Design a protein with these regions (language model features):
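Basic, helix-initiating cap at the start of DNA-binding domains
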Residues: 1-49, 66-69, 88
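Short hydrophobic/aromatic patch on the recognition helix
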Residues: 50-61
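Hydrophobic/aromatic residues within well-ordered alpha-helical segments
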Residues: 64, 71, 75, 79, ...
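Hydrophobic alpha-helical connector segments
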Residues: 70, 84-112, 164
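Amphipathic alpha-helical segments used for helix-helix packing
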Residues: 108-130
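Amphipathic alpha-helical packing segments from all-alpha helical-bundle domains
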Residues: 125-154, 161-165
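Hydrophobic/aromatic-rich alpha-helical bundle segments in the mid-to-C-terminal region
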Residues: 150-197, 207-212
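Short hydrophobic clusters on alpha-helical segments that form packing/core surfaces
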Residues: 25-33, 75, 79, 83, ...
Length: 212
């Protein structure tokens, strides 16, 4: 089943995206997908899982497809807003980097329940494929001061697009193989390790240049 694009429904729900009822519907829909899968999912399942009345559900969404599109947008927007807020107001670039990395790992764990991926892998795959560029942009934007700092350390511009995409692809891999405690520790230590690498690179460059 192909999900509707967000613009196919957003005009009908933009005024209520943050209302308690819509949030309950989104959360309930995710639970229902995990329990039933998309093909078997019905509007009644969403009503039961979210605890809203039939009238409330149909006030915002006229079909299951609209709910699924809204769920995709809800999860993606939540990531974009959350990763931006994670680093907001943190002046130290490495501390900002740490905060962003910790948020990203937590968000993946809390918003991509294993049961959904097991029951409905197609939903996950289509979601991440259609929102992949937005995830990359959100990470790159959140780490902009970090990239500025690293550019200064190494004396040249790093590839920001590749850096951000590597982080996104790495975090997505944990949906297939859950992260161990050791891997999680390495992920959380990425900021400090990258800074150490940048310092070492900066020290080596002048010596290498002197050999030429």
């Amino acid at each position: 089943m192909k999900l509707l694009a967000a613009e196919d429904f957003i005009d009908n729900t933009s005024d209520a995206e943050l209302s308690p009822s819509v949030i309950k519907i989104m959360s309930g829909a995710l639970d229902a997908i995990a329990a039933r899968g998309i093909r078997r999912l019905s509007m009644s399942d969403i009503i039961d899982a979210s605890g809203v009345s039939r009238g409330t559900l149909y006030r915002y969404f006229s079909s299951k497809e609209e709910v699924l599109a809204a769920v995709s947008e809800y999860v993606c927007t939540g990531f974009e807003n959350g990763i931006r807020e994670a680093g907001h107001g943190i002046a130290d670039p490495i501390e900002r980097f740490k905060a962003v990395m910790i948020f990203y790992a937590r968000y993946t764990n809390e918003n991509s329940p294993d049961r959904v991926f097991e029951v409905e892998p197609r939903f996950h795959l289509e979601f991440f494929r259609s929102h992949f560029d937005r995830f990359n942009r959100a990470v790159k934007h959140a780490l902009r001061p970090v990239f500025d700092h690293l550019d200064q350390l190494v004396g040249e511009a790093i590839n920001r697009d590749a850096f951000a995409e590597t982080l996104v692809r790495t975090q997505l891999s944990t949906l297939l193989v859950p992260a161990s405690d050791e891997w999680q520790r390495l992920w959380n230590d990425t900021a400090e390790n990258v800074e150490k690498w940048a310092h070492k690179f900066a020290l080596v460059q002048p010596r290498e240049a002197g050999k030429d």
